[in-house]
Amino acid sequence: MLQPTTCSKQQQQRQQPAIATAAVGGAAVQELLRKAAAKDHGALAAATATATAASTTATTATAATASRNSSNTWCHSDDMLSAGRSRSSSTTIDFNSRRRRGRLRGHAPSDLAMNKQHQATILDECVNIFKRLVLLTLKTISATTITKAKTRSRTAAQLPATSAASATSSRGASAEQLLHPSSRSRCRSRRCLRLPIYSILLLCLTTQGLGLGDAAKPRPAKQHFGGSNSNSPNQNQNHNDVLGGVGAPSQTSGEDEAEIMYPFQSGEQMFGLEEDQEQDPELNSNAVPGSDEDNAGNQRGINDTHNDNSTTTKTPLFPKDLFTKEQLENGAVILHIIGVIYMFVALAIVCDEFFVPSLDVIIEKLGITDDVAGATFMAAGGSAPELFTSVIGVFVSFDDVGIGTIVGSAVFNILFVIGMCALFSKTVLSLTWWPLFRDCSFYSISLLVLIYFFRDNRIFWWEALILFTIYIGYVAFMKWNVQVETCVKKMITKNKVTRVRSTDQLMPAGNAANSSETSMATQPGGSVTSRAASETRSGPPGSSNAGATGNSSGGGGTSGSTQTGAKFRHGLLQLMIHTIDPLHDGKVDEKATQLHAIASLKVLLDATKPQRGGATTSAANHVKINLKETTLADRPNGNIDTTLDSPSLSGRRPSWIEQRVKIQTRKFSIKAPEIEDEPEPLSMAWPDTARKRLTYVLVAPLLVPMWLTLPDTRTPRGKRFFPVTFIGSIVWIAAFSYLMVWWANVAGDTARIPPEVMGLTFLAAGTSIPDLITSVIVARKGFGDMAVSSSVGSNIFDVTVGLPIPWLLYGIIYGAPVEVNSVGMVCSITILFMMLVFVVMSIACFRWRMNKGLGFTMFLLYFAFVAVSLMFEYDVITCPF
């Protein structure tokens, strides 16, 4: 450090104007900074003008004094040291070059070095004063611009035409949002801010470039007006210490180095932000709350932080993670992803092995019909993970992860599940129009109502109640489903000709038994009844129409397609450990194919014999095949080996038809749709293969606690404790859903993925895996209507129960509407409604048959929906709503 020399009175008189002017400039800047910290914008403008004039005078006086000074030394004085700090050692002097210049001019090298050093000190201090003034001026301009933008946005938000636009936070927008117009700000006037913001940025870069030695110096820790940064060593210091003016030096670790503490060192500080939006949740907890207007809706005392889409976002109530942010970015997030997948398996096990069987006992105790039970209890059993995910999203994580999960799960169930059923079904399944029409009608109504309620990004309690009322209406409709279906079909088929072609005309030769026109149903009496199609012509009153009846959902009879599905629901645990394989149900014997063709197809009426006197009505008969004995083969989904008696024909038929049926008594193997009488209880036995043993070990940490705490209602002893299983299953589902959402949020934050996107893709697919497996198994058994109805029916439960119940509880408890923050979610729901229309149109185009072409079409629609929804979420496509 260079030592000051003794000054003469003449030299001090020459330096006095510069010293006094610099002191005035420093005092003006300090007063300006304090007014800026107090947010006194009225006095800030006047102080800015005064400080600017003082800075200009100081710069002029300093330059004049330096030019008049011709002595060999530039003296130090106490006044000069109080007016400006000595510069850091970063402003080094090239003594060799200056020594050469000094020798040419006749000056001593040491005197010349001190002269240049002190000139640089004064000039740099004036430059710093000017820099602060420029930055404060830019801050004032930015604050005024943001205030006007917020005022325009709030005014526009009150208008009906632009009610969807929400105002930005009163504490200001983040620097990232201001400097990057691609940021998802809800402000409608963001485009008009681009030019002044870029101009401000250019000026800031220019003023930062004036300090040549500042770029190499380490930046001090960021400080915020009105609050402290947890990364700073002095968290409790007052902001006046940080803004202590020109005369308060901040010493560094170097012995002879000093550093000027600039009040604004980054873009966020330049614009006067009180909160850093890139901080962790722990850092946000130390921030000072904003205005009373912003905190009016925050009734739980949770600190607000700025969000891209809404005015306030509450801190999630999740515990602190075991890993730091750096560790998560370096690979620890993989453990969270594995944990989320593990929770998918846990939810599937508790729903399939404990929750659904307990619901089956409740249905049996209450005597509820299959239609109502399928729409209520069984739908709740399959959609329990989505319901609890929505509850956690509203009350714990305070985001739209529940909405994203339910919307994504709905699309997954409609498109992906139906596509998988069409691809992996053994035969081409025929669908009945009534169940699809019924479920899609209620689902369309619920989606349209939900889109209308999302128009202002808020859900009130009465809106949630209306959504739940739609579900009550759906359950009431299912109570009289058979009567309504019969009435509607009578109205449609009244005085109309309905022709069902002969089944053997619909199939190529040699593949008759593989037709989906023929359905088999096991009768209680131990017989297999094969149903044939019919041809009906309108005739005069009193004509006998012996229409075919049965349990199958086809033709003109009632469908009766909605069943509880509990008997068909094979758990994920059984698929992983036990012997069930959904893709290998056993082979059908070729002889059974031939006999099945004879028994069910050749009896059909290929042509009706006209009679004199008008139109005739002819109907197909039932071919009743009595079973002598029935033995199950030793296979997982075994075939039925049986011996047939002579067939008997029921109904009045002409003798010329009886001659067409030639069935010989022979032993054959026939495959019929399986209906399990009693579900098997959970088996904890040690598996016999290495793969199953490995799976058993992996799921044992989940399975053993549930097996110890939840009675198995599929056993006679555990059936008495079904309330314990029911309540305990709900507790386990809530715990697993909490862990799933927590770890998914951590993984999404680490990968910079919004919660809505995580719910729309990853969580939606994971929570729908059990329904996918069940639907594929049901479709391979030949129940296409049940597979489609269960997919659409679970979506009705999700939208009308999974979403409104948490919203209704929130409105009752806190008396405030639920804020819906996602911009693209409204458009995603709209596209979901369009996809539902496309599904119905696709099924109609494929003539109500589930074939592989329909499956590939469903896959194409699913990936198109996901792609468009992601573009809405990331503002690649602007959502017009």
UniProtKB/Swiss-Prot annotation:
UniProt-listed InterPro entries: K/Na/Ca-exchanger (IPR004481), NaCa_Exmemb (IPR004837), NCX_ion-bd_dom_sf (IPR044880)
Domain of life, source organism: Eukaryota
Segments on the Extracellular face: 1-194, 352-375, 424-433, 480-720, 778-795, 844-852
Intervals, Cytoplasmic compartment: 216-330, 397-402, 455-458, 742-756, 817-822, 874-881
Cellular component annotations (GO), alphabetically ordered: membrane; plasma membrane
Cellular location(s): Membrane
Residues with attached carbohydrate: 69, 514, 551
Chain ranges passing through the membrane: 195-215, 331-351, 376-396, 403-423, 434-454, 459-479, 721-741, 757-777, 796-816, 823-843, 853-873
One MF term in the entry's GO annotations: symporter activity
Compositionally biased tracts (Polar residues): 85-95, 296-315, 512-537
Alpha- repeat coordinates: 372-412, 764-795
Region (Disordered): 79-111, 149-181, 215-255, 272-315, 508-565
Compositionally biased region (Low complexity): 149-175, 228-240, 542-551
Biological process terms in GO annotation: calcium ion transmembrane transport; calcium ion transport; compound eye development; intracellular calcium ion homeostasis; sodium ion transport
Membrane topology value: Multi-pass membrane protein
Any Pfam family the entry gives: Na_Ca_ex
Function as written in the Swiss-Prot or TrEMBL entry: May function in the removal and maintenance of calcium homeostasis during signaling in the adult and in signaling events during embryogenesis and patterning of imaginal disks. Transports one Ca(2+) and 1 K(+) in exchange for 4 Na(+).
Family recorded in the similarity comment: Belongs to the Ca(2+):cation antiporter (CaCA) (TC 2.A.19) family. SLC24A subfamily.
Protein name, as recorded: Sodium/potassium/calcium exchanger Nckx30C
